[in-house]
Every structure is written in C-alpha cells, then in structure tokens.
Design a protein with these regions (language model features):
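Active-site nucleotide/adenylate-binding loops and adjacent lid/helix of ATP-dependent enzymes
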Residues: 105-180, 186, 198-200, 228-242, ...
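Short, well-ordered beta-strand elements within core beta-sheets of diverse protein domains
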Residues: 155, 288, 376-384
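A short glycine-rich, hydrophobically flanked beta-strand micro-motif that places a catalytic Asp/Glu
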Residues: 182, 254-266, 311, 411-415
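ATP-dependent carboxylate/phosphate-activation module, predominantly the ATP-grasp catalytic core
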Residues: 183-190, 194-253, 257, 264, ...
Length: 424
C-alpha cells in the first residue's frame, strides 16, 4: 500500500456524488482540491481547497495545477468532465484512465454503437433521418442527442411529425449537433453495467435493473430505482459478458471504469449508452461495504501513482454483493414548491440504509420537466438475503416526506418491488 499522505488531488466538479471521493481521499491523508464554476458545490464544502475554475477551462486548470504542484487529477462520475479530464492529464503528464481513442468511443453514442457492431456486441436497431422522412421506420421511436447530460434532449415519438420535432430537439441538446434514432425499447428491462479494469482485465462491479417512473407522472424516462444485482445476472454471465470484456480489452484500457447501459432482450443485452467513468450515485459506498472492493480508493491510488495493479480490495464477482440486494432509490416529486422536508435524518438511522443525499433543498420550486430536475433525494439500501425487501422500501417511503404548501405529499413514482423475474 502506498503512503499518499500530503499528495495533492484535484477533483473535477463538486457535485454531491463526488463527496465520497473527497471523504475517501482525506481519510487517506491526501490534500483535496475541487474545482467548478459554482461557489457552493457540495464537495467543495468538504475539500481542503476550492477553485472557481470551470471544468471545461482546460488551459486555466492546467496552469493552476502547475502553480500548486498538483500530483493527480480525477473525474469520478461526471459526464461533461470526461474529455477535459483527459486533456488535463495529458498536458500535465499525469496518470489517466484513458486515451483520446477510448474517450472518443465511450463518450459518443454514435461512435460507440459502431464499435459495438464491429466487436459482436448487440445494439438497438437504428434509423437515419432519411428513414424517418421516407417512412421506413417502425414506431414508436426513441430519439436522443449523440452526447448530452442526463436525459436532456430525449423524445419518444409515435409519428413522423413527432419524429421530425424530436430530431430537431435532440440536435439542439447535443454538443456536436448529432442525434441517434432507435427502436423504442419501452417494454424491455433497462440495465446499467459497470466494469472496473485492473491491469488490463475488466471486472464486472455493477449490474443492475433500472426501473423507471410512471408515464402518468411524466417520469417514464427517469430512473426511480436500480436493483442490484440484476435478475438477468446468470444470463449475462452465460451469454454476453465475454463479448463485452473482449470489446473493452480491444480499447487497450489498463485501469479504471467503463460504464455501459443497455436493454435485456432474450439472451442478450442491447447496449445504447457508454461512458468512461463510474455511474452517478453512491453505489460505490454500498459495494465497498458489501465486498471490501473500493472503486473510489482504487482510482484515487491510480491517479496519484499510475499503478494499474493498485486495486483496493478484490473486484472478482463483487457485483453479486455477497448475496445481498442493493436498491438505489431516487425520490421524485411532482411540480410545485417543496415547503417542508421531513424524516431525512431518521431514514439515515435505519440499519439497511447505507447512504442518503438531499439533492434539492427545502423551499425550492420543482418544474414540470420530467427529467433530473424532479429528483430531490437519493438513498442507498443494502438488504440481507433473508430480509423482506418491500418492508425496507416502505420504511423509507413512510419516513421521508416532501410536503407542498398545503401539507400534501409531493412524492410520486414510488418504486414497488415485484420479486425476481428470472430464476437465479
């Protein structure tokens, strides 16, 4: 184990999901710096030092790093920081989890899809703008930007007229003006998978079923709970994982995360969205508690040493969580003013609750956007195999409450556990 005491680590973006990175680094004796353009970012409040430099201002960050003798740089799970992170590391000659090629493939949906096809990994059937105009498509369609943050710019289209509008909308939300038009996979199970590469070998560390909100709440594109491990874990290991691992190896990645989202379709996964980062949320805290493997501490160590073998804990089969079940709950609310929030601290005291984050504070007005702007809190549950899962869910929902100005509950699209759909 390395002695990293006193080393300086720069973390790109101070969102609350980076709090765990700051905390872990400080526990390791590392001097932490967080930068973004927001003065009150949550992770900045925990860090030893905060910079008011936008994560996309590579020139300014590089110069500041030189002045302050920064020893390592990280972007743990923020989409817009992926390519700036690579550029900063490259110019400072600091350890980086990827190359220009890997970030090109894993940050652009179009490039990624082509790469999957080349390597025998299944993808969603796709259409061009010309197909739409000529009527050579099967509705409904799912249209999205080639690259964007969160779920912005996405549309489900049931007609040519809607598709034309959806394409225009996606183009405006994409940083490169591109879009992807695919078969809408509404009735297929959405999954999130994360691999962590150590010394060139990809290990599956996260594999979960993503459950969406209700259409009547306009949240049917927003994840309200991820259940881990997925009910399709056995199928994945038997039919899919080897192809995905070989594709990741072909990129030449030696260390770090690869995040892939897809849909279960019979005995395969049809992938649609990549990233060279860890997923958002705080699943990593649950993973470390359940298995001892730490994605956070592993990446921190790599950022400061460049050691591709320096995993903290054993990643083999850790996604199974030693037989437990994890639920990553996102609490969503209807539009309106959040007059009162109750029970947050009481939820954190529950034995099966590993973490909690209040994302949007009391008093804020929630818009009717149907996207991440309606996510107000997140909780992570780790449930032993002999414990009733729905009872644990109910304990959270009955305790954590968001009230409007009339004292009425604002929480909508609560996740309901329906048991495992596939035999393990």
């Amino acid at each position: 184990m390395y002695n990293l005491k006193g080393k300086k680590l720069l973390i790109l973006a101070g969102a609350g999901v980076h709090n765990k990175v700051v905390r872990a680094a400080k526990e390791m004796g590392i001097y932490t710096i967080v930068t973004d353009y927001l003065p009150d970012s949550p992770a900045k409040k925990l860090a030893d030092e905060a910079w008011m430099l936008n994560i996309t201002d590579v020139d300014a960050i590089v110069e500041k790093c030189k002045e302050e003798h920064v020893d390592g740089v990280m972007n743990f799970c923020i989409d817009p920081a992926q390519k700036p992170y690579y550029e900063i590391c490259k110019r400072l000659n600091l350890p980086c989890i990827g190359t220009k090629e890997t970030f090109d493939v894993l940050t652009d949906k179009r490039t990624f899809k082509d790469y999957c096809v080349q390597h025998g990994v299944d993808v969603i059937p796709e259409y061009t703008e010309e197909d739409v105009m000529k009527g050579n498509v099967e509705y409904p369609l799912f249209i999205k930007p080639t690259n964007s943050r969160g779920s912005r710019g996405q549309s489900v289209c049931y007609s040519k007229e809607e598709a034309i509008k959806g394409i225009a909308f996606a183009k405006t939300e994409s940083s490169d003006g591109g879009f992807v038009c695919e078969k809408y996979m509404e009735k297929y199970q959405d999954i999130g998978s994360a691999f962590f590469v150590v010394d060139g070998e990809p290990y599956l560390v996260k594999f979960g079923d993503r459950h969406l909100g209700k259409p009547e709440d306009n949240l049917n594109k927003q994840v309200v709970c991820t259940k881990l491990p997925s009910d399709s874990s056995d199928m994945f290991e038997a039919c899919v994982i080897d192809r995905v691992k070989e594709m990741i190896k072909s990129l030449g990645i030696k260390f770090g995360p690869v995040f892939l989202q897809g849909f279960v379709d019979g005995n395969t996964i049809r992938y649609y969205d990549p990233a060279q980062r860890m997923p958002g949320g705080d699943y990593d805290v649950i993973l470390e508690k359940a298995t001892g493997f730490s994605t956070v501490r592993s990446w921190i160590t790599f950022a400061l040493t460049g050691d591709v073998k320096g995993a903290v804990g054993n990643p083999k089969q850790c996604y199974r969580l030693n037989g437990g079940t994890a639920l990553l709950l996102t609490v969503t609310v209807r539009p309106g003013k959040m007059e009162k929030i109750l029970g947050f601290d009481d939820v954190l005291k529950m034995s099966h609750v590993i973490y909690g984050r209040q994302i949007i504070p009391e008093g804020e007005i929630i818009p009717a956007t149907g996207d991440i702007a309606q996510r107000v809190a997140a909780f992570g549950l780790l449930i032993d195999r002999d414990v009733d899962i729905q009872e644990c869910l109910d304990s959270v929902y009955n305790t954590y409450r968001v009230l409007d100005e009339n004292g009425n509950s604002m929480v909508i699209s609560k996740y309901k556990y329906e048991g495992e759909k596939n035999e393990k």
